[in-house]
């Protein structure tokens, strides 16, 4: 039995009509149009594995910025209130923990919990750290950087979460 071997670029041109990727065979090669249209890919082939792109967007997305003057973490926590969040600094790490007990929604009961841990740069002034929650559910953790050679004051302490009434100015990813 003869099997025709096709060049990969030929299969890619037929991508939306003939998905050639099974079980992440081409992992790391980027996203194509049919990766962003999950309803189309599931109707074409029952063996085609859906992209993980959607699950990444549904999880709490965070962004870390560190420039010359300050260190900032943006974290989407829209399902949590300030009372559900705990922000703590231990040594060179900031730990953000969110948990709310079981609540009833349209489909039954739901509970959520997450734990994030970020390494702080060594030159962040830990005595001037702040944390706020915007009206649209974006948690902003920030701290100024100090000139090198000065003591950053490493200790364990809790950072209170304040609520802001305006939406976040963080870029949407």
Swiss-Prot record:
The gene is CRYAA. The modification Deamidated asparagine is found at residues 101, 123. Belongs to the small heat shock protein (HSP20) family. The modification Deamidated glutamine is found at residues 6, 50, 90. Zn(2+) 3 binds at residue 154. GO terms for molecular function: metal ion binding; structural constituent of eye lens; unfolded protein binding. The modification N6-acetyllysine is found at residues 70, 99. Glycans are attached at residue 162. It is found in: Cytoplasm; Nucleus. Contributes to the transparency and refractive index of the lens. Acts as a chaperone, preventing aggregation of various proteins under a wide range of stress conditions. Required for the correct formation of lens intermediate filaments as part of a complex composed of BFSP1, BFSP2 and CRYAA. It comes from Ceratotherium simum (White rhinoceros). The lineage of its organism: Eukaryota, Metazoa, Chordata, Craniata, Vertebrata. Its main location: cytoplasm. This is Alpha-crystallin A chain. Residues 1-63 are annotated as: Required for complex formation with BFSP1 and BFSP2. Zn(2+) 1 binds at residues 100, 102. The modification Phosphoserine is found at residues 45, 122.
């Amino acid at each position: 039995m003869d099997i025709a071997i096709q060049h990969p670029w030929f299969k890619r041109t037929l991508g939306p009509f003939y998905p050639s990727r099974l079980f992440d065979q081409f992992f790391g090669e980027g996203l194509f149009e049919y990766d962003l249209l999950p309803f189309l890919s599931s109707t074409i082939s029952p063996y085609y594995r859906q992209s993980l792109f959607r699950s990444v967007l549904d999880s709490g997305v965070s962004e870390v910025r560190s420039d010359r003057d300050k260190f900032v973490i943006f974290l989407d926590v829209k399902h949590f209130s300030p009372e559900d969040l705990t922000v703590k600094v231990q040594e060179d790490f900031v730990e953000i923990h969110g948990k709310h007990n079981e609540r009833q929604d349209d489909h039954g009961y739901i509970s959520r919990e997450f734990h994030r841990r970020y390494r702080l740069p060594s030159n962040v002034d830990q005595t001037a750290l702040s944390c706020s929650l915007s009206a649209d559910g974006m948690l902003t953790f920030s701290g100024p950087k100090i000139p090198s050679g000065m003591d950053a004051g490493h200790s364990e302490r809790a950072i209170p979460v304040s609520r802001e009434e305006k939406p976040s100015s963080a870029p949407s990813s």
